[in-house]
Amino acid sequence: MNLKEKNVLVIGFAVTGIPLVKVLCQLGANVIVNDSKKEEALKESMKLLSDHPIQYILGKHPEIEELSAPLDLVVVSPGVPLDIPFIENLRARGIEIIGEIELAYRLAQGHIVAITGTNGKTTTTSLVGEIFKNAGRRTHVVGNIGVAFISKALETTADDVIVIEASSFQLESIVDFRPQVGAILNLTPDHLNRHKTMENYQKAKFNIFKNQGAEDIAVINYDDVKLREESKQIYAKKVYFSRRTLLEEGVFVEDGKIVALKDGHKKEIISKDDIFIPGNHNLENALAATAMTLSLGVDIDVIQHTLKTFKGVEHRTEIVDVIHGVRFINDSKGTNPDASIKGIEGINTPILLIAGGYDKGSDFDEFINAFDGKVKHMFVYGETANTLMETAKKLNFIDVTKVQNLDEAVKKAYDIAIQGDTVLLSPACASWDMYENFEMRGKHFKEIVANLRR
């Protein structure tokens, strides 16, 4: 892809913006950066690019006539909605508009494995990456996991494996992006404030399969009825995984073991009790990872070893500490109700739950109903605090306390905890009302817990 002397507009200067601009400059493009944030808020990012000749248009989206030269390409950061008037006007002029993973795909070489879904993406992406690394493959783990795909694209070679965690925001802007193996782990309502409807959200997720050919592989959760029905339209070869059903072909659980059945030949992978990371949600992640890596020829011994040793990822049911018999678990990655339900299901001790955060328009009925006698008390904070309280009381869960912030929630939970209890941060909400991302929220939780020991 020749971008030398091409005029490229980057809209959105968030996490992917810096590596994106660096690569575009490296390729000789004339780069214009536009962000609705003002210069004051972006100074630190701009310092990192001070050696590059970049034109900035900050504090607003401009009129097209204000641009100094005709545009050859527009690259939109994932956090920028594609239906804002500025982007609509650019599209109406016939200018190509793509996202960061589309650009990275056009520049990269190698075997692409892409993973999406509402929950489990980060754990599964990390696990798949670890399996390929243990198999001796040069592996890049990128995407919505904290390392922009574009930052590694020019380093890749034809033999590399690129494992991508792909969000709905990233997938809605693809054009040619085609993974050799694509997977949807599950699908429940999320990000409806951005996508407006469940249909739009689902369509964005299914974009992961839209360019696949008959020789490519689509890995799908058989237990998700909606996914199973919609998968009939997929052109790629389908490989199902299931925690609940004995499949005629695919990867599933039989007699407490993960098995793979293909062309009448059954292979035993591992006992589910030997998987290091606990919980049914992690069993599903292990099934998906097994299906994906087997599809690309990884030996069973390597998969088995990795499932026995992989310790999970930070901020996902991460045990932080045990203080005077009270366990503290950081599940800050629980950014929607379904993710937090899975977090609660994986804990077998009485729970003091901390929930709340940015309002994505979620419904919390199923979340509250999932307490199932496990949750002794819930502390709520953030934009969704009142909604959570009202939903809990409507469903006859009355042990709820509203607090101002995470610090107060942790301290009050610890005050009433007894030996054998678990203080669980699993917010069921995004972090953006108080924190830049869920990682910062999780790190703050761990700092608060550490201070309890002092």
UniProtKB/Swiss-Prot annotation:
Record localization: Cytoplasm
One of the GO biological process terms: cell wall organization
Residues annotated as binding ATP: 117-123
One Pfam assignment: Mur_ligase_M
Enzyme class: ligase
Keywords: ATP-binding, Cell cycle, Cell division, Cell shape, Cell wall biogenesis/degradation, Cytoplasm, Ligase, Nucleotide-binding, Peptidoglycan synthesis
ATP-binding found in the keyword field: yes
Catalytic activity from the UniProt record: UDP-N-acetyl-alpha-D-muramoyl-L-alanine + D-glutamate + ATP = UDP-N-acetyl-alpha-D-muramoyl-L-alanyl-D-glutamate + ADP + phosphate + H(+)
GO MF annotation terms: ATP binding; UDP-N-acetylmuramoylalanine-D-glutamate ligase activity
GO cellular component: cytoplasm
E.C. number: 6.3.2.9
Chain segments annotated as transmembrane: none
Pathway listed: Cell wall biogenesis; peptidoglycan biosynthesis
InterPro entries, alphabetized: Mur-like_cat_sf, Mur_ligase_C, Mur_ligase_C_dom_sf, Mur_ligase_cen, MurD
Claim: tRNA processing is one of the keywords in the record: no
Function: Cell wall formation. Catalyzes the addition of glutamate to the nucleotide precursor UDP-N-acetylmuramoyl-L-alanine (UMA).
Family note: Belongs to the MurCDEF family.
NCBIfam families documented for this protein: murD (TIGR01087)
Protein's recorded name: UDP-N-acetylmuramoylalanine--D-glutamate ligase
Organism for this UniProt entry: Alkaliphilus oremlandii (strain OhILAs) (Clostridium oremlandii (strain OhILAs))
